[in-house]
Regions:
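Periodic small-residue-enriched repeat registers in elongated scaffold domains
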Residues: 1-384
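Extracellular receptor-binding modules and their adjoining Ser/Thr/Gly/Asp/Asn-rich linkers
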Residues: 362-567
């Protein structure tokens, strides 16, 4: 049936109305101007619209519905996919069950949706919106929105974009499956990665890039290229795998599971940590903090300013200190533990170590040689001093002696040797030799064997301790990694008579051992006859009594006590 002017209804049960319309499909309906409904049960209306497929619908101006059940409306739109829908201006619904709207949009993937201006949804089930955004072919379920952005990975999401602060186009790109790119000039390349933030000038530096799988880059011009890496802040790089983290400004976390923070720091050793400014942690599991510090040894720690911890498990702190020996510690200012001096410790200023496993107090010149004021040598136990030993109150030099009866002796008694033995007893008036006076508080105490049994090590005929070189085996963790490297060291030769099943009791804790002052100012018991400026000798009870010669009496300190000088 035709009505109007110049219309043609050639299809069975077709209906054409308006001006120059054509309804050639069965049960088709055309109306308006120059419309064509050629598909069965199709409907064309408006001006120059074409519905050429079964049950298709074209309306508006210059629209085309070219596939079954497709719907085109608006101006110059095309619905070419089965059950597709195109609306707006110059939109194209190409894929099956797709939907385009807005201006110059394209929905090519199955069940895709494109809206906005010049957006393209090529991936199946994808969605584009905004201005010139796109999802690429193969990017199923992707979503691109904003301006100029592209989502190329399956289930990826790109948003934001537009222009940088200089006005340069700066779109975002999400190419990794399940990735997310947002902000300005960002890129998410890795699987399930996330890039956010941007750049002030994309022509000079790109925005954040999340290249590693499960990585996260945020801030300005950051990069996370390692697996599960995280970069944040300004121009930071997290390139180490398995959880590296770079934050702050111009920091780099390049080792596995490393962490760099602060300003221009680098953590390159496995599980290393660098913080502060210009610090570097290159040793495995090392830590560098402060300013311009370097922790290059495994498990090393450098802190302060311009310090270096190079030895395994070494520690450098302070200013310009260097710990080159394994397990060593340098602190203070311009101190150095030299290579090979394992386990040494130095503190102070302007000095270097002399021995391994030893303690050093440096006091070198600012311009001149490096020096030590004090050294305790670990292997021998020797104490080296470049100065005076000062005792604030105690005055005598004493040595430890054992009593002949095994009983304690209180301070203030004169003592002598008991016969031909090395043991002592109280001195009497008839003794021609006086060893000294039992001291209550000596300034120096010798032969105390306070730290060990006096025969713990093998000695020669002159009582000199004998030493040997021993090999220290390497130590590995449960995964086979070397925790401590093998080495050699000098040790005293252990006496085979030593019994480790017995507990050693130091002489100072045993009643039979007493300190005898043999030189210096000593307090002595007296019978009340001694006079300052006079002399004394022991009576039969081992206490002082006035004498014509003997020990000089310096002063009376109590009714029954005087201070004498022993030499």
């Amino acid at each position: 049936m035709g009505e109007g002017i110049g219309n043609t209804a050639s299809g069975f049960a077709a209906h054409a109305e308006g001006l120059n319309t054509t309804a050639s499909g069965a049960a088709a309906h055309s109306e308006g101007f120059s419309t064509v409904a050629s598909g069965n049960s199709s409907h064309a209306e408006g001006s120059t619209a074409v519905a050429s497929a079964s049950a298709s619908h074209a309306e508006g101006y210059l629209t085309q519905a070219t596939n079954d059940t497709a719907h085109a409306e608006g101006t110059s739109t095309t619905a070419s996919g089965v059950a597709s829908h195109a609306e707006g201006y110059m939109t194209h619904a190409m894929g099956e069950s797709t939907h385009t709207e807005g201006s110059m949009t394209l929905a090519a993937g199955a069940e895709a949706h494109a809206e906005g201006n010049a957006t393209q949804a090529w991936g199946d089930y994808s969605h584009t919106e905004g201005l010139r955004t796109s999802t690429q072919a193969g990017a199923a379920s992707a979503h691109a929105e904003g301006e100029g952005n592209s989502a190329a990975g399956r289930a990826s999401h790109a948003e934001g974009g537009g222009a940088d602060q200089q006005g340069n186009p700066a779109p975002n790109f999400a190419s990794g499956a399940g990735s997310h790119a947002e902000g300005v000039g960002t890129t998410s390349l890795g699987f399930a990665s996330h890039a956010e933030g941007g750049t002030s000038d994309v022509t000079a530096a790109a925005g954040p890039v999340a290249q590693g799988d499960f990585s996260h880059a945020e801030g300005q011009s950051t990069s996370a290229s390692g697996t599960a890496a995280h970069a944040e802040g300004f121009r930071t790089i997290a390139s180490g795998n398995l959880g590296s983290h770079a934050e702050g400004q111009n920091t780099t976390a390049s080792g596995t599971a490393t962490h760099a923070e602060g300003f221009q720091t680098t953590a390159s050793g496995p599980s290393a940590h660098a913080e502060g400014a210009n610090s570097v942690a290159s040793g495995a599991f090392s830590h560098a903090e402060g300013v311009s510090t370097l922790a290059s040894g495994a498990y090393a720690h450098a802190e302060g300013a311009d310090t270096t911890a190079d030895g395994q498990a070494s520690h450098a702190e302070g200013f310009m200190t260097h710990a080159f020996g394994a397990n060593s510690h340098a602190e203070g200012e311009n101190t150095t533990v030299l290579p090979g001096h394992t386990g040494s410790h130095i503190m102070g200023q302007n000095g270097s170590t002399r021995f391994a496993y030893s303690w050093h107090l440096a006091n070198g010149l600012a311009v001149g040689p490096s020096l030590n004021s004090a050294v305790i040598e670990g292997v021998t136990g020797n104490l080296y001093l470049d100065g005076t030993v000062i005792s604030p109150a105690a005055a005598d030099y004493a040595e430890m002696f054992e009593t002949s009866d095994g009983q304690a002796l209180e301070p203030g008694y004169f003592v002598t040797f008991d016969g031909g033995s090395e043991k002592i007893r109280k001195a009497g008036a008839k003794d021609s030799y006086i060893l000294g006076v039992v001291s209550g508080r000596p300034a120096v105490l010798a032969d105390s064997s306070d730290l060990r049994w006096h025969k713990l090590f093998v000695t020669d005929e002159w009582d000199r301790i004998q030493y040997q070189e021993v090999e220290v085996p390497e130590v590995r963790d449960t995964e086979g990694n070397v925790v401590r490297a093998g080495s050699s060291k000098t040790e005293p030769v252990l006496n085979p008579e030593w019994n480790d099943a017995e507990d050693y009791i130091p002489r100072l804790q045993r009643d039979e051992w007493v300190a005898v002052g043999v030189v210096g100012k000593l307090l002595v018991r007296d019978d009340g006859t001694c006079q300052p400026g006079g002399y004394c000798m022991p009576n039969d009870e081992g206490i002082a009594t006035s004498a014509v010669s003997g020990y000089r009496v310096m002063s009376r300190t109590r009714d029954d006590q005087v201070r004498i000088f022993v030499r």
